[in-house]
């Protein structure tokens, strides 16, 4: 018990100790000293994520970031639809489903294309180098979905020359298994990272099992000290169950969810200017049985259909940041997003077996440009102004 308490104490100290020259990329499109930004940013680094040994980044963020709260319902997993957990709120903004709080991966928005809310089980620790949480509005750079704040997952990189492989395994109560294997390579300008995981639990209640498996891969190449290209892909699948209330349990409330994302970016970094152009594509397939209860007062019978949906989100982003004179930084950029999907009830039994009941089929487009101006007045005062149209 003493060892566990000491580990938690050390973990908290590491996460909350910021070095004087720590740089972040959230709240700004270029690496910037955190002291020069007009908003509060918390950083949870890779060491803290590894010490916590959580398959999802959300439990770690809840422990480490002031004002951030997430709902949970069991040993592992959050699920989707009715009875799901994973709702996030930051300084009172958010909730379930999460709105006003934007989740990013390397600056790209991550949410379900149909419902517009994040999928908590998709944000796995295996891909994260660090997580930057901006507490406050950031709509100039990221749009109206970031009114309450931003959670930006910065993906892992291979920093050290050579080949390294890590394997983590854990087993505990309720037949709970956590596993992760990662291989990292860096040779000259070439870098690669491949990681896979398998996690499962029976849960502490009947019909509360959870199973998740997936993988993450990232390749990069530095053409010169000033230009580089990188691409990555992440796919995860999870099976979750909703047990219902203890006094009125649910039967067959099962979910089978697949989420994926991929991106490609070309970056430039010079002494006085830096920028990037990137493309990303996110997708998801949901197969959900709403289940039923055995209480006759509920008048809730087994459903002859399953909710079946496919959603996606595609985007192209460009920005360039320049230092015009001492203490100045001017950033301009354009974002284009296309998102949507289709949903239906698919009958799997009964008289309508094989039929499909249309629910929605839609696609939306969004384009915006922005300019951000920042000027250091002194070592303790910075002027920041921006506009997004």
What kind of region is each of these model predictions?
Residues 7-50, 58, 269:
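Short, acidic, small-residue-rich periplasmic hinge/interaction motif at the N-terminus
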Residues 41, 49, 61-62, 131-133, ...:
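Non-catalytic regulatory/gating segments with a bias toward low-complexity or hydrophobic composition
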Residues 59-108:
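Extracytoplasmic beta-strand/coil segments of soluble accessory domains associated
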Residues 92, 181-185, 217-221, 264-268, ...:
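Residues on the lipid-exposed face of transmembrane beta-strands in outer-membrane beta-barrel proteins
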Residues 108-135:
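Short acidic/polar hinge/loop motifs at secondary-structure boundaries
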Residues 138, 150, 154-185, 196, ...:
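Short strand-turn segments of transmembrane beta-barrel domains in outer membranes
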Residues 184-200, 228, 234-236, 275-302, ...:
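Surface-exposed extracellular loop regions of Gram-negative outer-membrane beta-barrel proteins
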Residues 201-208, 212, 226-313:
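Flexible loop and strand-edge segments within Gram-negative outer membrane beta-barrel domains
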């Amino acid at each position: 018990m003493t060892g566990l308490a000491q580990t938690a104490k050390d973990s908290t100290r590491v996460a909350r100790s910021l070095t004087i020259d720590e740089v972040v990329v959230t709240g700004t499109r270029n690496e910037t000293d955190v002291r020069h930004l007009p908003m509060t940013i918390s950083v949870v680094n890779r060491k803290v994520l590894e010490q916590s040994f959580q398959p999802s980044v959300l439990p770690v963020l809840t422990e480490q970031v002031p004002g951030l709260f997430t709902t949970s319902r069991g040993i592992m997993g959050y699920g989707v639809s009715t009875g799901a957990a994973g709702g996030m709120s930051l300084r009172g903004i958010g909730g379930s489903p999460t709105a006003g709080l934007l989740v990013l991966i390397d600056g790209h928005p991550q949410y379900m294309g149909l419902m517009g809310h994040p999928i908590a089980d998709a944000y796995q620790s295996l891909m994260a180098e660090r997580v930057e949480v901006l507490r406050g509005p950031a709509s100039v750079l990221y749009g109206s979905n970031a009114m309450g704040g931003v959670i930006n997952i910065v993906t892992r990189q291979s920093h050290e020359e050579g080949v390294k492989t890590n394997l983590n395994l854990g087993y505990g109560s309720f037949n709970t298994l956590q596993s992760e294997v990662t291989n990292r390579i860096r040779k000259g300008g070439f870098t690669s990272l491949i990681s896979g995981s398998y996690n499962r639990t029976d849960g502490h209640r009947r019909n509360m099992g959870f199973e998740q498996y997936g993988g993450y891969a990232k390749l990069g190449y530095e053409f010169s000290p000033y230009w580089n290209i990188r691409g990555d892909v992440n796919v995860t699948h999870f099976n979750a169950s909703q047990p219902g209330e203890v006094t009125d349990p649910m039967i067959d409330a099962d979910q089978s969810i697949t989420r994926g994302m991929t991106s490609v970016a070309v970056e430039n970094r010079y002494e006085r200017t830096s920028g990037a152009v990137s493309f990303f594509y996110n997708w998801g397939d949901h197969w959900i049985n709403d289940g039923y209860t055995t209480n006759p007062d509920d008048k809730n019978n087994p459903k002859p259909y399953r909710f079946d949906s496919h959603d996606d989100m595609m985007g192209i982003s460009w920005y360039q940041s320049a230092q015009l004179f001492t203490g100045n930084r001017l950033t301009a950029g354009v974002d284009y997003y296309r998102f949507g999907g289709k949903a239906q009830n698919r009958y799997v039994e009964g008289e309508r077996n094989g039929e499909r009941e249309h629910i929605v089929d839609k696609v939306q487009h969004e384009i915006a440009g922005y300019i951000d101006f920042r000027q250091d007045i002194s070592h303790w005062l910075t002027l920041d102004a921006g506009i997004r149209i």
